[in-house]
Each structure stands twice: as C-alpha cells, then as structure tokens.
Amino acid sequence: MDETIDYPIIIAGGGLVGALTALLIARQRRDWTIMILEPNVAGPAQDKRTLALAAATVATLQKLGVWTQLAKHACAIEHIHVSDRGHLGMTRIHAHQHGVPAMGEVIGAAKLNQALYQACLDEPNIHWCSDARFHSATPADKHIAVTYQQGEQTIHCTTQLVVGADGQRSQVRQDVGIAMHTTDYQQFGVIATLQLAQSLNGWAYERFTDSGPLALLPLPNQQASLVWSLTPAAANDVMALTDTDFIHACQAAFGYRAGLFLKVTDRAQYPLQLHLAQTHIHQRRVIIGNASHTLHPIAGQGFNLGVRDAITLSEILVSADDPGRYHYLGAYQQQRQQDYRRIIGLTDSLVRGFSNQYAPLVMGRNLAIIGLDWCYPLRHRFARQTMGFQG
C-alpha cells in the first residue's frame, strides 16, 4: 500500500555528498526530519577510489565529529611537488609556510562513506531509507510530491525540498530535464594503488609528463595512490600490461623522485570529462555534487567542490521557514557560481596547458611553474585554493 509521509527535505543519494549534506542540515535544524533515499540495501555503495580531502573539507568533518575515527586511516599532505618532466619548471608548496599543519588528507572513499553512513544512522532526525530509488517529483505551491521505489513498492510522499545528490547519472536532474554542458578531454584516468620501497613522507606529487599528467598521493604503509591521465589508446595499452610491466611503465613516466615502485593493486580506468549543469535549481529541487558537476582529477578538487555545495546549502537553510522557496535556492545558486568558475577555470586550464607539447606553450607553462616557486603571494593564493579556502 502506498503511504504519504511529510519531510521538510528529501535527499536522493546517500553517498559522500548526500550523507554530508544531511548531517550538516540535521545538526543545525533539530526541528526538521530529513529522509535519505539510498538505492543500496546495506549502506552506501562500495567505493574503491582514494580521495584527496582539502584542509577545509577535513575541518568540516572535524566539526561534525566524524574525523576522529578516520584520522588513523588517513595520510596528511604536508608538501606538494609540481613539476614538468624533462623541463626546468618545478615548484614546492609546504603546509607550514601557509600556517597549517597539512594542506589536506588522503583517505579511502569507502572509509569516509562508512563513517558518514554511521553518523547518519546515529542522528535522530535523519531517516535513512535503504533500497530506495528516487523516481519523480511534481511541484506544487508549497510542497513537492515525490515518488520513489523501495523494493517492489511504489511510495508517494511530500516534501518542501528535494536535494539531488544522486551522482553523475542523477535521476533528480533527468526528471527535471536539466541539460549538462560537457567537455570531453579525450583522456582516460588510470588509477591504482602502488606499493613503494619508501614512504612518501607527506609529499604529494603532480608530475606533467609527455604521456600525460601523473599524480601520486601519500597513503599509509608505504603506499601511494596513482592517478595517470592518458589518451584512450594509451590507457588501454597500459591497462593491458602485466603488473610488472605496469610498474615499469609508471616508473619510466614518473622517474625516481619518489623512490622505487614495487607492486600495484586495484587498477581501473575511467573517461575524463568536465560536466556542468546549466542550472542547479528548479522548482523546489537542487542538485549538488556530481549530480551538478564532475571535474578532471588533475587538481583533486572534484569531491571538495561537492563538499562546499553541502556547506553552502546548509548555511543558507539554517534559518529558512520553507527550505524549498526560490528565495533560498536562488541564493544558493548565486553563491556557488564564483567557486564553480574559479575551480573549473583552474582545472580546465591545467588540463589544456599541460597536455600540449607545443614548444611555446611548454616554455610558457614552465615559466609559470618557476614563477609560482619564486613568488610567495602567488604560491600562497594557489595553496589556499587547493586547501579549499575562498580567500
């Protein structure tokens, strides 16, 4: 039997951004009950990615009280080394020079997912609905009617705001018909976990090579997370290699600055594209995180951008009488635009500038890297951006 239940907010998607949004809002609005519709039966989906959490993201997790249990599984980014292999361009950024102990932390997405999931279960005004898929919504004057599937049941309920945190293939976005602007970089990201002969000791590397940008992020137990951007053909070739040959290919591309690469596990590849929704709000609906934008991983900013979506939305709704009113959603969209332009502009320019071997461009980007190393105000501004701070 269909049943009707009223919630001030329904969040489609209980992944990282959806769960975080629910916690941020629930902690400040004890008078609201928030329902999360999560398609998986037992908690969030298993996620094998490794995430680079900006310092501002870590601060948010600390505020929510979930970082304490995660810290032992994370590895701090205390230094960043950026270089263009075979050229003079190189810059080093040290956290202590910018007044922080670390510019971020590296952690497995599955660990963070589980911690946020448990925190949601412990929150009395969050109702976690497993095996539940958002289907459609019909707006009215002061509410929006939602239909979702739970198991074999079709259930109807009403809410004041639907938050689409349901990923790149967002059903909330598709139900509205919001178009996406897409840039295909004609690259694939090859990701893997490397076992090293020595620890990275808090160093993260962004190495621009002839074959494509290659990032190494520090992990516990003398491991590193690899993100290697390659042409589709090159990515297929690399993925077809044996583990031994894959290690040799990585070592040849990166060099020996991080020491010897010994073993590889958890190899995968995925297409690298920029997706940005033409609007992020529509009649009592808002899309956030990967539902509204996905970025190239070159600067590790994608998830952190989604975290700032959650923070901004929760701050705007802190004193809202009706969370779905255009007054609040319009303010949300307006506030997020500058951050989108800034981060998308940064990542897009890095991809285009460092994936091109045209000689004048190579010379220009190396001068830019050297300038970044020599000019503290410019380096400080860049560091603040990577740490997720707006100023």
Regions found by a protein language model. Give the residues of each.
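N-terminal FAD cofactor-binding segment of flavoenzymes
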Residues: 48-85
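Beta1/beta-strand and adjacent pyrophosphate-binding region of the FAD-binding site
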Residues: 2-15
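Glycine-rich FAD pyrophosphate-binding loop
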Residues: 24-49
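C-terminal helical "tail/cap" subdomain of flavin- and related membrane-associated enzymes
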Residues: 315-391
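N-terminal Rossmann-fold NAD(P) dinucleotide-binding loop
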Residues: 18-19
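Conserved N-terminal helical subregion
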Residues: 5, 70-76, 81-175, 184-188, ...
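Conserved FAD-binding catalytic core of PHBH/FMO-like flavoproteins
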Residues: 61, 153-156, 161-267
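FAD/FMN-dependent oxidoreductases across multiple families
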Residues: 236-324
